[in-house]
Amino acid sequence: MSFPKGFLWGAATASYQIEGAWNEDGKGESIWDRFTHQKGNILYGHNGDVACDHYHRHEEDVSLMKELGIKAYRFSTAWARIFPDGFGNINQKGLEFYDKLINELVENGIEPVVTLYHWDLPQKLQDIGGWANPEIVNYYFEYAMLIINRYKDKVKKWITFNEPYCIAFLGHWHGIHAPGIKNFKVAMDVVHNIMLSHFKVVKAVKENNIDVEIGITLNLTPVYLQTERLGYKVSEIEREMVNLSSQLDNELFLDPVLKGSYPQKLLDYLVQKDLLDSQKVNNMQQEVKENFIFPDFLGINYYTRSVRLYDENSGWIFPIRWEHPAGEYTEMGWEVFPQGLFDLLIWIKESYPQIPIYITENGAAYNDKVEDGRVHDQKRVEYLKQHFEAARKAIKNGVDLRGYFVWSLIDNFEWAMGYTKRFGIIYVDYETQKRIKKDSFYFYQQYIKENS
């Protein structure tokens, strides 16, 4: 069985990771500009000031996409490029950049898929509380609707947010991403304000009969209980704790998006641990219920699985620790586990109302080297091949999977890791900005031809 007719083969990037031009043509400062310019936040002090210089090289990059043969390109718009202060004053030059990019894509037969928020909040909004401030819902709405209304005739697929988990928890609990806050309660406020922002925009699109599809992208990680220890019987409490820890990664986001409520068991546990108060939980549930609206599709970013076991001395909010099974790992230290993608897709199909799904990111970082002007990234080719197979198997088993976007089109700024991790199927020499097509580029090009 090959992939269904019209299956959307694509590649993905994000504004801060590739654009550069951080303060050009009227762009405002974003939280990632601020965060990377502060010493000690990013490996080797790297920043995205120039990144892949896509802002000046978009024509070259679109011609590479055309050569690759992708049907769609997923990218994000930089809020601070359009509203330098987060709201109010509109920067026309910022809009003109996206006008050009979208026109180039359409002219080359590539469907633009736009992510409205991929982590680069205007710093001016962070100064008044950012995602933890309930007012953000209105600021985001103003920005999102401006972009949707401007491009609705050319852009038919919209993603409200990329990875709310990372925005909330990496940015506001673990503090390893911008804005670098370390407070679980604040992170939960962020989760909630993102959900309300998502609903408000989806509702406006539907109520105004705007002829587009709109969804959200969640990074989901299937969690497996480590049971392979000899003669070991798993107790009920162990199973429950591993399950609750999984809900913090997955259901905390999936449930409100697809069912209109947060997982109550998880919230009760957090109240019991004094990480939330019960009145707040009631308000959260009530507001999600009142504002809920079902999206047109779900985007899933999948990279690896998580294997966990019970450990009451873990010191984490759950008595759980992570196991690292023997096997193949990428440069990010992530296990290569394509079966996890299949398991995840089947679980969503069986646990949630039916919804079209796109894999909006999947890929791997390896230590790529240029040899004779080529990059022989055989491990990435294998990684992609195995995950395409898992996707195909899921479709065969009734999953309504409509498309797949490789992460990433091009090597780029990998957040806290700076430029040390390469995910692209196109290599970038950051000194010269020269692009080199990796072996995985040619593999993907051929695969698309054979499966379209």
Curated annotation (Swiss-Prot):
In terms of pH, the activity is described as: Optimum pH is 5.5 using p-nitrophenyl beta-D-galactopyranoside (pNPGal) as substrate. Retains 80% of its maximal activity at pH 5.0 and 6.0, and 20% at pH 4.5 and 7.0.
Q: Where does substrate bind?
A: 17, 118, 162, 303, 407, 414-415
UniProt pathway annotation: Glycan metabolism; beta-D-glucan degradation; Glycan metabolism; cellulose degradation
Query: Might you give the EC number(s) for this enzyme?
Result: 3.2.1.21, 3.2.1.23, 3.2.1.37, 3.2.1.74
Please state the biotechnological applications recorded for this protein: Potential to be used for bioconversion of carbohydrates and biomass in industrial scale. Its high lactose decomposition activity makes it applicable for the removal of lactose from milk and dairy products in food industry. Has high activity in synthesizing galactooligosaccharides (GalOS), non-digestible prebiotic food ingredients, from lactose by transglycosylation. In this process its excellent thermostability mitigates microbial contamination. Has high ability in saccharification of lignocellulosic biomass such as steam-exploded corn stover.
Task: Provide GO CC annotations from the record.
Answer: cytosol
Activity as a function of temperature: Optimum temperature is 75-85 degrees Celsius using p-nitrophenyl beta-D-galactopyranoside (pNPGal) as substrate. Retains 100% of its maximal activity after incubation at 75 or 65 degrees Celsius at pH 5.5 for 12 hours. Retains more than 80% of its maximal activity at 70 and 90 degrees Celsius and less than 50% below 60 degrees Celsius. Half-life is about 11 hours at 80 degrees Celsius and about 1.5 hours at 85 degrees Celsius.
The record's keywords, sorted A to Z, are: Carbohydrate metabolism, Cellulose degradation, Glycosidase, Hydrolase, Polysaccharide degradation
Kindly state a single biological-process term from the GO annotations of this entry.
xylan catabolic process
Q: Which Pfam families match?
A: Glyco_hydro_1
Task: Please state what class of enzyme this protein is.
Answer: hydrolase
Tell whether Transport is among the UniProt keywords. Answer: no
The UniProt activity regulation field reads: Slight activation by Mn(2+), Ni(2+) and K(+). Slight inhibition by Fe(3+), Zn(2+), Co(2+), Mg(2+), Cu(2+), Na(+) and NH4(+).
Reactions it catalyzes: Hydrolysis of terminal, non-reducing beta-D-glucosyl residues with release of beta-D-glucose; Hydrolysis of terminal non-reducing beta-D-galactose residues in beta-D-galactosides; Hydrolysis of (1->4)-beta-D-xylans, to remove successive D-xylose residues from the non-reducing termini; Hydrolysis of (1->4)-linkages in (1->4)-beta-D-glucans, to remove successive glucose units
Q: Key word Hydrolase present in the record?
A: yes
Active site as annotated: 163 (proton donor), 361 (nucleophile)
Q: Which domain of life is it from?
A: Bacteria
Q: Which family does it belong to?
A: Belongs to the glycosyl hydrolase 1 family.
UniProt subunit comment? Monomer. Homotrimer.
Function in brief: Has high beta-D-glucosidase, exoglucanase, beta-D-xylosidase, beta-D-galactosidase, and transgalactosylation activities in vitro. Has a very broad substrate specificity with the highest activity with p-nitrophenyl beta-D-galactopyranoside (pNPGal) as substrate. Active with pNP-beta-D-glucopyranoside (pNPGlu), pNP-beta-D-cellobioside (pNPC), lactose, pNP-beta-D-xylopyranoside (pNPX) and cellobiose in the order of decreasing activity, respectively. Very low activity with soluble polysaccharides synanthrin and locust bean gum.
- Name under which the protein is recorded: Multifunctional glycoside hydrolase
Originating species: Caldicellulosiruptor owensensis (strain ATCC 700167 / DSM 13100 / OL)
The organism that produces this protein has a lineage beginning with:
Bacteria, Bacillati, Bacillota, Bacillota incertae sedis, Caldicellulosiruptorales
